[in-house]
Amino acid sequence: IGGINCAKKAPLPADLQEFVDGSGDAGFIVFTLGSMVSTMPAEKAKQFFDAFRQIPQRVLWRYTGELPDDLPKNIKVMKWLPQNDLLAHPKIKVFMTHGGTHGIYEGICNGVPMLMFPLFGDQGDNVHRLVARGVAEKLSMLDVTTETLLAALKKIINDKSYKERMETLSSIHLDRPLQPLELATFWTEFVM
């Protein structure tokens, strides 16, 4: 049931809270490609590191690959992220994701525009739907460059319509007579 994973939000660990609170007006970006993809070829990772070093936003990246010797100070790399808790923070600007169902519902629930990199399965369809609604942009992991990544991030951050449309989509999604867990319970009991 869409959004069942959105209800509970926990306080961030102290180091993450300090990192995101210290992002100032520029805010921060969350980047994760889901639980199945936590690394990428070094050449591709370099393009992401090069792009991130050029933006004022801080970046929280779920990544287990090799780090550059000159890791930019605006990037915090972690093996695991409390994704929903971070997406609920008021300074979040963009959610960079592969477009898995779990993650997109967390992004929608929290009203966060997305930059999406579909990799397999239903992700392509999920991404297509959000791009069509004007709340996300799509890049191909195979073709992305430092320049295309920078352009997409700047577009989403600077064009306020992405955030406005996502907040509208979020309010529609959250406006329901039963919360997702209540709905699941109702239908489970109904069929029994």
Question: What is each model feature region?
Answer:
Residues 1-192:
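Catalytic core of nucleotide-sugar-dependent glycosyltransferases
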